[in-house]
Amino acid sequence: MKVLVIGNGGREHALAWKAAQSPLVDTVFVAPGNAGTALEPALQNVAIGVTDIPALLSFAQNEKIDLTIVGPEAPLVIGVVDAFRAAGLKIFGPTEGAAQLEGSKAFTKDFLARHQIPTAEYQNFTEIEPALAYLREKGAPIVIKADGLAAGKGVIVAMTLEEAEAAVHDMLAGNAFGDAGHRIVIEEFLDGEEASFIVMVDGEHVLPMATSQDHKRVGNGDTGPNTGGMGAYSPAPVVTDEVHQRTMERIIWPTVKGMAAEGNTYTGFLYAGLMIDKQGNPKVIEFNCRFGDPETQPIMLRMKSDLVDLCLAACDGKLDEKTSEWDERASLGVVIAAGGYPGSYSTGDEIHGLPLEEVADGKVFHAGTKLADDDRVLTSGGRVLCATALGHTVAEAQKRAYALMTDIRWDGSFSRNDIGWRAIEREQN
């Protein structure tokens, strides 16, 4: 069968790489893909942008694609799933209506409140003065979020009132996030440890994926501005069996049932960003309507199940007939980014020292890369690569991931040197 993966990031390289391992699959196309997918013998890039729905649809029809897997959020919130389904094609992802869970933070907070799903106390604002009055009433630390899609960067955790007021001005008056910031959500600062809880949903049934923990801040020790994610590991020890059960009962099931009851039946990957307090109670920080990036990379390295088989079952509403199998070992991925990220950075730099052959129990996934005409690999984004490895402990996986990147360099490249530190601290104590 033929599979199409939509996207060009590290997440899509990992999903396509995993899909190509399925015995059901003959060909995997990636639209538009990157240098990493271009260099994989089992994958084929197609030069179509992720939001060009008419072109994606006609390609899928002409090539008789049997299954499409959507990586990023942008095509989901503009209805790629609706368009493919209307044409009778199998596609795994949420409809435009269901993708509002990521597309609008205000929609999500109101939905959580309606269904009594645990989350931070909040209010939505479109005007500066009421927002500032609310800030002064609540005090800092406090969190300000742009309502729409801002590539994971539209969230300011303000530790002082001045910082909070500046963020409100930037978003509502200064247009810091364009259309995404015309409405903002101000919510209480939650203390605890974050985890990424990702499941597959077929509208009715849920199949949990392995847990993971992302590292959002650009600097070591979780300092500096938020990014799309500087590294991740799986499993996340903070999600104990008890926390897992609470998350399913209090958050995932009520969300799936609530969406169906409101006429937005949810299908696809559902990613709950959780904050887990000292008592092990999870609250929703955010929902994403797709797999996380960089969490996908370490999770796919651990996945023993056939991803394509699971996606097909989900498209047919038969996820209850499936289980997911995972490598017992931990995995960890470190993002190598372009100098200046998450601010402005240069592109078109040649990347040196990429591994020439596949390594056992490890993989360098490509994100912001492109292949030059002479087959040199060049940078084309802020997050460029993700070096990912398995290990019997998170510490061992960390050591192997950093070893994979020893020779990789380009002008200005950088990474955090402490990915996985929370889990490693736990292992040592």
From Swiss-Prot:
Family matches, as Gene3D superfamilies: 3.40.50.20, ATP-grasp fold, A domain (3.30.1490.20), ATP-grasp fold, B domain (3.30.470.20), Phosphoribosylglycinamide synthetase, C-terminal domain (3.90.600.10)
Cofactor, free-text remark: Binds 1 Mg(2+) or Mn(2+) ion per subunit.
MF terms in GO: ATP binding; metal ion binding; phosphoribosylamine-glycine ligase activity
ATP-grasp domain location: 109-316
Pathway: Purine metabolism; IMP biosynthesis via de novo pathway; N(1)-(5-phospho-D-ribosyl)glycinamide from 5-phospho-alpha-D-ribose 1-diphosphate: step 2/2
GO BP, sorted A to Z: 'de novo' IMP biosynthetic process; purine nucleobase biosynthetic process
Subunit (UniProt): Monomer.
Protein name, as recorded: Phosphoribosylamine--glycine ligase
